[in-house]
Amino acid sequence: MNDLIFFPLALVMALAIIASAALPGKDRLACGSVSGAGTNYQTILVEGNDLCRMNASGQSELQRQEADGKITAISIAAGAGLLGDRPDRNPHFRLAADLETQFAGHQIKVTIVARPSDERGASVFQANYSAGQEGNSGWKTFRMMPDYKEYSFLWDVPPRGAGETAVDYLAIRPVVPSKVRSIDVKSVRFDRIRKTPAS
């Protein structure tokens, strides 16, 4: 083989091997904190593959529902008496620092699209927006319809000083009177409604 062909071809093959080794997670979902990524912070929507950002804290179990290789919903299951009161010790979305900063000092509307799971479905679920040591919304309770429906609540996120961050979470859990109960969450939306008046 001619050197003019062999060496460039060998270089291309070597670069392809290095690139495939350096990017082992290139097909994995980018799961982590929920972030606005510099977009319009008036509305943040978590749906589809972004649902992988939910953490199964506490003694809970998450299961992805998929169609055509994409997440369509996430099932949250828990046993009776196994979840504590702290939002970060329950199934939750962790909000990134950019959302903490943008939401601080504002009224936020949280809208969750959910339903009882087909198996062991809960009839009631709860949600809690926590701003860490700054406080939380308390557990908001919703009685569900059989099909997907929107459930919303408002909360005034406490203001923070410049450069000050907390650890914000949105926790979502089934209410479990006995045995195990499960809910399906299709999407979560955060709407920044207005700046909270100074007290």
Locate the predicted segments by residue.
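Extracellular carbohydrate-recognition regions
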Residues: 7-9, 13-67, 197-199
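Short carbohydrate-recognition loop motifs
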Residues: 65-89, 143
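Short beta-strand and strand-turn-strand segments in soluble, beta-rich domains
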Residues: 90-92, 130-139
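Extra-cytoplasmic beta-strand recognition segments
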Residues: 95-120
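Trp-centered recognition loops
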Residues: 107-109, 113, 146-153, 183
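Beta-strand acidic-aromatic groove motif in beta-rich domains, primarily in extracellular
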Residues: 119-130
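Extracellular carbohydrate recognition and processing domains
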Residues: 134-167, 178
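Extracellular beta-strand ligand-recognition surfaces/modules
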Residues: 156-197
